[in-house]
Amino acid sequence: MSDPSLYTYPSPLQGWENLPPLPNERAADGKSFVNPPATQKSTAYTEFPAPINNGIRGGFDVHIYFLQSDPTQVQYATKLWERIRREFPELRVYQLWDRPIGPHYTGMFEVNLFTPEQFGAFIPWLVIWRGPLSALLHPNTGEDVRDHSQRATWLGQAFPINLGPLRRFVEAKEKKEEEEKAKA
């Protein structure tokens, strides 16, 4: 879906350099390692790491896919959409599309997650309740094409994403922003 060589990646140890070496001591299970205690709990428990959006846009989108030509999947998706709206009313849930829309080649609906707490509750729930459907999870970082490709995670079978319309949308948005800047 995406060529990782198109992007650069900061070191995962950024901000954690120059610390003492980790111990090689094994835990009681003999397999895992004993980790040194943290001085404070990671902020990732309460806010998404940069560059993921922590505002009104939402940190993650979850696109739940179904084959609109399969009556069983359409029925399951419709019931799942209702269940999500009832069990997770704090989440933003969009229309159930029974046809391709935007970069999505098949029927789907979208759910927005705003906090790590919501992510931690909803994704394990969805792993069980997605049934025969697939789900695309992606962060919202402002890099829409990369978010839908290189940063995407799938539950179930991966579907192709039509990145062409997404690229054109991004280009049009950037052009409009440039025109508005020029007017100011």
Where is each model-derived feature located?
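Long, contiguous binding/interaction regions
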Residues: 2-184
